């Protein structure tokens, strides 16, 4: 029987084919397409409808991935009212359907296949078509950790086959199993087997009565135990394992408490698990009468030579001891380091030192209290009259300084001086004497601290630094007035006919120009000296703009000098021409 996938798709819209709504994104469309394509591909499934559905999925994916076709299709869905259509819930659920395989034998039933698996190798049929293909559900469910004894296995099958030949009974396994492989053995709530007519016939053939479920499960040679279903065998194996674990835990607990308990209790505890593993004598008697030839010597599960030899050990055997030791070592490896200060115990010497110091402090406190009680701050003078009044006179009281107080300074005012300066109770305070009292007080001026001088020096230094970075224009040789000086104009020599007057005018013009030249040269020389003096300061970043203004002043000064030179050249040229013409 093979399994075939029967797909179901909602083919109302292209979105519903892919199991999506109209709001799905392109990535969701692509993911749904890949998922359905893997399931509906003709090479992957043997269903007749898979090819047609696969083509529909591919067509829907091609339309929804194309933007133009998707817009047109969405417009058509809105017109038809299917834009908000939700795919059906019962679709996109792939059901598996059982299908008969052509190669399998139709005559072979499940009971026969199950019966074949339970037979030993030498009794199994061989050839083609005698068995079924092993699947995950039909595999043996016997746990892999179950112990296997070859001799007992062969002996059990030998005895069972011998008894079948003796009684001539049919195959018992076929009677105990239905077509679906489930066991017909039914257990009641009380733990006994359901004794119907069919089972009575079976037990009459075998020559036995129905026993309790516990005796059949414990007896390895029982024919009923071999006929139980796999599910019941698993339950029995699990119960046996739980019982063994509980018995091992009890045995380990008895070993741990062997030192503290008495010898009688140790013997009693060691005997208890053995009693539990034994079967009642009535059941043993019935088993011996029915199956004397099938009985095997029972071995106690707790017979261990190592444990019997060493009863004082808390472990059942060396495996438990090895497990406990390895677990302890692993736990110590991953344990965090503990601070060594916490592990150091408090020494007695340190405690004694603290105790001595505490005793000294207590003695000092007691002595201070006694002194305060004995020495009163105010002592009353003795009065001769016995019938003295209870009123206290301030004049007769003497003030004594207590022992615990520090010595007062010379400048401090004592209580006696304060008593003399204060007015009496009946005397009124006169405001006229305030001026005299204020004048009598000597007021001393506090000297200035060194910190104030240091702060003043820092401020002065800062101001000097600012002056260095911003020098005055006069120090740099800049005189803006020289730029305002007018250059003398060229005189009109055409109106002068006399040569002597011409010479006088030329000399006057030349003298004015020379004076102006002299002042310009003096200013330029002063500027040159200032540049050499403040060269370090001018090359700093904050003084670049100042240096630029200085150079602009020098340029304007040189322009003025050039204009003056040109005018002098023109006057000399005119004077030379007039002299040549007169001659």
UniProtKB/Swiss-Prot annotation:
Listed under GO biological process in this entry are: chaperone cofactor-dependent protein refolding; protein refolding
Which superkingdom does the taxonomy of this entry point to?
Answer: Eukaryota
Supply the name of the protein.
Answer: J protein JJJ2
Q: Name one GO cellular component term.
A: cytoplasm
Further information: Present with 184 molecules/cell in log phase SD medium.
Task: Tell me which UniProt keywords the record has, alphabetically.
Answer: Chaperone, Cytoplasm, Nucleus, Phosphoprotein
GO MF entries: unfolded protein binding
> Where are the compositionally biased (Basic and acidic residues) regions?
262-281
Record-linked InterPro entries: DnaJ_domain (IPR001623), DnaJ_domain_CS (IPR018253), J_dom_sf (IPR036869)
Which PROSITE patterns does the entry mention?
Answer: DNAJ_1 (PS00636), DNAJ_2 (PS50076)
One matching Pfam family is DnaJ
**The keyword Iron-sulfur is annotated on this UniProt entry:** no
Residues recorded with modification Phosphoserine: 229
Q: Which Gene3D superfamilies match?
A: DnaJ domain
Residue ranges annotated as transmembrane are none
User: Quick check: keyword Transcription in the entry?
Assistant: no
Per UniProt, subcellular location reads as: Cytoplasm; Nucleus
- J domain spans which residues? 11-79
Gene label: JJJ2
Bias kind Polar residues: ranges: 215-224, 298-313
Record field: compositional bias (Low complexity): 240-252
Disordered, as annotated region:
215-313
């Amino acid at each position: 029987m093979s399994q075939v996938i029967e797909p179901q798709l909602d083919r109302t819209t292209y979105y519903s084919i892919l199991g999506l709504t109209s709001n799905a994104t392109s990535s969701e469309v692509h993911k749904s397409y890949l998922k359905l394509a893997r399931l509906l591909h003709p090479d992957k499934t043997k269903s007749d409808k898979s090819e047609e559905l696969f083509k529909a999925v591919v067509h829907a994916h091609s339309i929804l991935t194309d933007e133009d076709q998707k817009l047109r299709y969405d417009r058509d869905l809105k017109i038809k009212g299917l834009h908000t259509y939700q795919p059906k819930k019962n679709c996109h659920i792939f059901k598996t359907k059982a299908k008969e395989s052509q190669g399998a034998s139709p005559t072979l039933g499940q009971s026969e296949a199950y019966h074949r698996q339970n037979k030993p190798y030498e009794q199994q049929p061989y050839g083609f078509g005698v068995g079924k293909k092993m699947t995950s559900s039909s595999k043996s469910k016997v746990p892999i950790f179950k112990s296997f004894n070859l001799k007992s296995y062969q002996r059990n099958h030998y005895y069972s086959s011998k008894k079948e030949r003796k009684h001539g009974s049919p195959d018992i396994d076929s009677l105990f199993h239905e077509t679906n492989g489930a066991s017909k053995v039914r257990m009641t709530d009380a733990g006994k087997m359901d004794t119907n007519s069919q089972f009575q016939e079976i037990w009459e053939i075998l020559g036995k009565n129905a026993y309790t479920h516990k005796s059949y499960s414990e007896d390895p040679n029982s024919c009923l135990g071999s006929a139980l279903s796999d599910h019941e065998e698993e339950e029995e194996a699990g119960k046996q394992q739980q019982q063994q674990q509980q018995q091992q835990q009890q045995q380990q607990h008895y070993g741990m408490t062997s030192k503290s308990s008495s010898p009688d209790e140790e013997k009693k505890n060691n005997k208890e698990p053995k009693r539990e593993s034994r079967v009642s004598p009535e059941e043993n008697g019935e088993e011996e009468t029915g199956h004397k030839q099938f009985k095997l010597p029972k071995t106690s599960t707790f017979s261990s030579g190592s444990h019997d030899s060493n009863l004082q050990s808390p472990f059942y055997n060396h495996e438990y001891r090895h497990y406990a030791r390895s677990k302890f070592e692993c736990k110590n490896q991953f344990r965090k380091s503990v601070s060594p200060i916490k592990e150091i115990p408090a020494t007695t010497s340190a405690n004694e030192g603290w105790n001595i110091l505490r005793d000294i402090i207590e003695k000092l406190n007691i002595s201070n209290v006694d002194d305060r009680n004995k020495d009163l701050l105010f002592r009353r003078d003795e009065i001769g009259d016995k019938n003295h009044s209870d009123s206290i006179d301030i004049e007769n009281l003497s003030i004594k300084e207590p022992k615990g107080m520090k010595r007062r300074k010379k400048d401090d005012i004592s209580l006696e001086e304060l008593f003399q300066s204060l007015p009496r109770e009946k005397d009124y305070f006169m405001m006229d004497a305030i001026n005299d009292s204020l004048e009598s007080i000597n007021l001393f001026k506090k000297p200035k601290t060194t910190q104030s001088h240091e702060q003043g020096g820092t401020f002065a230094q800062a101001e000097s630094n600012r002056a260095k970075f911003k020098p005055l224009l006069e120090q740099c040789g800049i005189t803006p007035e020289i730029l305002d000086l007018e250059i003398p104009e060229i005189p009109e020599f055409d109106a002068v006919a006399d040569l002597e007057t011409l010479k006088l005018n030329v000399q006057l013009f030349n003298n004015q120009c020379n004076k102006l030249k002299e002042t310009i040269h003096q200013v330029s020389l002063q500027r040159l000296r200032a540049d050499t003096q403040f060269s370090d300061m001018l090359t700093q970043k904050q003084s670049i703009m100042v240096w630029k203004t200085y150079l602009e002043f020098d340029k304007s000064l040189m322009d003025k000098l050039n204009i003056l030179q040109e005018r002098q050249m023109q006057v000399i040229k005119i004077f030379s021409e007039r002299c040549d013409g007169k001659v």
